[in-house]
Amino acid sequence: MNIPWLDWAKQIQAISQAGLEYGENGYDLERYEALRSISIEMMSYFSETPVDKVRELFASETGYATPKVDIRAVVLRENKMLLVKERADGAWSLPGGWADIGLTPSEVAVKETKEEAGYEVQPVRLLAVLDKKRHNHPPSPNHVYKIFILCELVGGEALEDGLETTGVGFFHESELPPLSVERNTADQIQLMFELARSTASQVLLD
């Protein structure tokens, strides 16, 4: 979902963050701090997120602002896709989460699948790199790139009650459960089915 006001607020936040990192003039630093506060209030309003939550999100952000990276594992078994039930909202998503410092994207996919679903997987190939704002997600304070990695199931067993998840299942594309649209949309799940079944090696890029 592309909302101009929210996009503009994110750009203002990025400019102010860079200015606070590299600026030297005291008056300019005050102006950058004011811009940062304005951007936080704008993002809170347009994303319907509490101001304190948005401020907390950016409290540790310094230097040149860059998009966050969300990594999702795409795992098929008998033409059904692995989904986990999110404890946060009770809806379902592909196993995954934010990229971790020190880990490769493939390592994150393996780690998140084990932690959230209980299964051991082997990364096979990259399916897609999508820009979250170009898809029908709820508004978000963050600019996010989403990486989808096809993985082969090699072991483990379902984890029914994890730290962040409360259920695990394999679902046919015509029988999907309620999805956690903050994390993945129905269109994206359908797209992952198509890309995973394809013999072509082309990666889908926004």
Predicted regions and their residues:
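Acidic, metal-coordinating catalytic segment for phosphate/diphosphate chemistry
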Residues: 27-29, 33-72
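N-terminal strand-loop-strand
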Residues: 55-94, 121, 125
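Unchanged
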Residues: 99-122, 131-188, 192, 204-206
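Long alpha-helical scaffolds
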Residues: 9, 16, 36-39, 117
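Nudix hydrolase/Nudix homology domain
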Residues: 1-32, 91, 158, 163-206
